[in-house]
Design a protein with these regions (language model features):
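Bacterial N-terminal signal peptides that target proteins for export
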Residues: 2-13
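N-terminal signal peptide c-region/cleavage motif recognized by signal peptidases
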Residues: 21-23
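A short beta-strand-turn-helix
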Residues: 35-52
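Short active-site neighborhood of thiol/selenol oxidoreductases, capturing the structured segment around
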Residues: 48-65
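Thiol/disulfide oxidoreductase modules built on the thioredoxin-like
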Residues: 49-50, 117-153
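Structural microenvironment flanking redox-active thiols in thiol-disulfide oxidoreductases
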Residues: 63-105
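Short, internal strand/loop/helix patches
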Residues: 85-87, 102-129
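A short, polar/charged loop-to-alpha-helix boundary motif
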Residues: 151-163
Length: 163
């Protein structure tokens, strides 16, 4: 092997190692979601399991507001009755704001908010910063995914019977 071929092989190896993590983030139909445990707004633990049929993911406050708007007027337990879990990444929120204002306010919501306080879980799932990622699950595996940037469209999707 020549020096040029050896350098090209090393470069290719490094390139593959750099790009491999990027491709691992894209979820494909049939991928099993790794279980995780986070606390909700009441400091109660929730572990993602095979009972969840829909996972809603918010990467920002704007995305979380979409869900809040979509659920206006819905009864307490609406998401749970649909085996739907909502996880919000709040790592970017200053701790004092989260602790003193945001999380106490979330306790008045009619739905459970699983809080990703350290961005441990949400970054595993692809999606736009300002949209809600919807992962449709069956037995812990992804069967469909879509994003919502409109509260009314999200509300309509949530109102449809789940399969």
């Amino acid at each position: 092997m020549t020096q040029h071929e050896d350098n090209a092989l090393k470069l290719l190896s490094i390139l593959l190692l750099v790009l491999l993590p990027l491709s691992a983030q894209a979820l494909q139909r049939g991928d099993r979601l790794a279980p995780w445990t986070l606390l909700d707004q009441y400091d109660q633990p929730y572990t993602l399991n095979d009972q969840a049929q829909t996972l809603l993911v918010a990467r920002s406050m704007d995305a979380a507001k979409l869900l809040k708007t979509a659920l206006e007027g819905k009864p307490k337990g609406f998401l749970e009755a649909r085996h739907t879990v909502f996880v919000a990444d709040i790592q970017k929120m200053p701790l004092i704001i989260a602790t003193m204002f945001a999380i106490p306010k979330m306790r008045d919501y009619s739905y459970r908010v699983i809080l990703d306080r350290e961005s441990r879980v949400v970054p595993q799932y692809p999606g736009d910063e300002d949209k809600i990622l919807w992962l449709q699950l069956r037995d812990g595996k992804v069967v469909d995914q879509q994003q919502f940037g409109d509260a009314q469209a999200l509300r309509s999707a949530l109102e449809k019977p789940q399969m």
